[in-house]
A protein has these predicted regions:
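Short, surface-exposed coil-to-beta transition loops
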Residues: 40-43, 58-59, 66-67, 128-133, ...
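Flexible, surface-exposed loop/linker segments and immediately adjacent secondary-structure boundaries
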Residues: 85-116
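A generic structural motif
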Residues: 28-34, 57, 73, 122-124, ...
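Short, surface-exposed charged micro-motifs
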Residues: 44-46, 62, 107-109, 132-136
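N-terminal leader/targeting segments and the immediate start of mature chains
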Residues: 1-41, 48-52, 175-186
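Short, hydrophobic/aromatic-rich segments at coil-to-beta transitions
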Residues: 21-26, 49-56, 114-120, 141-146
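Non-transmembrane domains of secretory- and envelope-associated proteins
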Residues: 113-116, 124-131, 139-186
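An acidic-aromatic
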Residues: 46-92
Length: 186
């Protein structure tokens, strides 16, 4: 019981820090579906997150959420799409929001791995759609280092954060492109 309270306290501290400060990091996102292919798909970019707000760039795409509007810009098509996402869509986009929604329906496990703390959330039943959610954080700083989402049917998504840091400054969580074609779906 004591371990569960410590694990829950670590997660709540992480979530509270993300509400108060902006997490800025480079990232590598890797997905692999063992049933379809053994070749992983890998993407790199950078991100900023503050509460529910986020901004990320990778290859020829930018995405941002300012708390109301989701902005997605494609360099290839020079198109800026604006939409109002549902809570479910936001949860699927932001792994920290996803972890928060999993807390009530999961059991927790925690273990020290060097200077990191690894927290594993395992759903009580299969209705969550995943097998487990693994979060690694730097113990001393509460900086997230990696997230693994083990989904049903052999799909694994890994988000590795490099050069992660907290800052008091928040970037713009909106995208404005003067010459872009705007597709407003709000």
């Amino acid at each position: 019981m004591k371990l569960l309270l410590i694990t829950f306290a670590i997660l709540q501290s992480l979530f509270a820090t993300l509400e108060q400060k902006t997490l800025v990091s480079d990232f590598m996102l890797t997905t692999v579906n063992s049933q379809l292919s053994t070749t992983p798909m890998t993407y790199t970019g950078n991100l900023a997150m503050h509460g529910k707000q986020f901004a990320l760039t990778m290859f020829s795409m930018e995405a941002a959420y300012d708390g109301n509007t989701l902005y997605i810009y494609s360099d290839d098509t020079e198109e800026l799409t604006l939409s109002t996402p549902t809570e479910e869509e936001l949860t699927q986009t932001n792994p920290f929001l996803y972890a928060q929604t999993l807390l009530p329906v999961c059991q927790y496990a925690e273990k020290a791995v060097g200077d990191k703390t690894q927290i594993t959330l395992t759903p009580h039943d299969r209705s969550a759609g995943i097998q487990k959610f693994v979060l690694r954080i730097a113990t001393a700083t509460l900086l997230p280092v990696a997230i693994e989402i083990h989904e049903d049917e052999g799909k694994l998504t890994t988000l590795r954060l490099d050069n992660a840091r907290y800052t008091e400054e928040a970037p713009s969580f909106a995208i404005e492109k003067e010459d872009a074609f705007v597709n407003d779906l709000r």
